[in-house]
Amino acid sequence: MNTSWNDILETEKEKPYYQEMMTYINEARSQGKKIFPKEEDVFTAFSLTPFNNVTVVILGQDPYHGEGQAHGLSFSVLPGVKIPPSLRNMYKELAEDIEGFIPPTHGYLESWAEQGVLLLNTVLTVEESQAHSHAKLGWETFTDSIIEQLNEKKEGIIFLLWGAHAQKKGINIDAMKHSILVAPHPSPLSARRGFFGCQHFSKTNELLREKNLSEINWSSITLD
């Protein structure tokens, strides 16, 4: 069966919880509140990584809440925006883990998404300068459904779950069907507790090789 994100998203969008959530968000925007990312970027992760192309999922929490940062991909920021601390630590780990990886001067991860890495936050919007302000609005239900669809309809996805939040979110993933790699979050608060040295990027490629799937060229972002 050829599943598309469109089918999955449209089913969710018809549900009352989703409609109530969007009413709240649209009212906030119309009142002049700054909601990130921009309306047209909320579903960027799905447009860049079609359902049938997903081989890896990197789960984030909620979008960056500073001006111009968030654009719909977890951990990623738009070109020209200062690289956030967690992403800087991801680059440090990549430089140790992947031969020849040179940390780029930007934090734009679009080329990973185009290779099949679903960069998914568990909450897809946030109000400016207010971290977690859109938690409990309904996005958690929405992204639970996304993960459930991936879990049920695909096999052999590699889920990278960093930190307690992501690990709790992935508790129902079938470890017989999929690969689950866990580590502390790359934030400065926890990176030294085991994110550094976790080698998740090379391990992901080892697992993809075993499945005869294309490896991720993590260094593609240095060419952007």
From Swiss-Prot:
It catalyses: Hydrolyzes single-stranded DNA or mismatched double-stranded DNA and polynucleotides, releasing free uracil. One of its GO terms (biological process) is base-excision repair, AP site formation via deaminated base removal. GO terms for molecular function: uracil DNA N-glycosylase activity. It is an enzyme of class 3 (hydrolase). CDD domains: UDG-F1-like. Keywords: Cytoplasm, DNA damage, DNA repair, Hydrolase. InterPro entries: UDG_fam1, Uracil-DNA_glycosylase-like, Uracil-DNA_glycosylase-like_sf. Belongs to the uracil-DNA glycosylase (UDG) superfamily. UNG family. This is Uracil-DNA glycosylase. It comes from Aliivibrio salmonicida (strain LFI1238) (Vibrio salmonicida (strain LFI1238)). The lineage of its organism: Bacteria, Pseudomonadati, Pseudomonadota, Gammaproteobacteria, Vibrionales. The gene is ung.
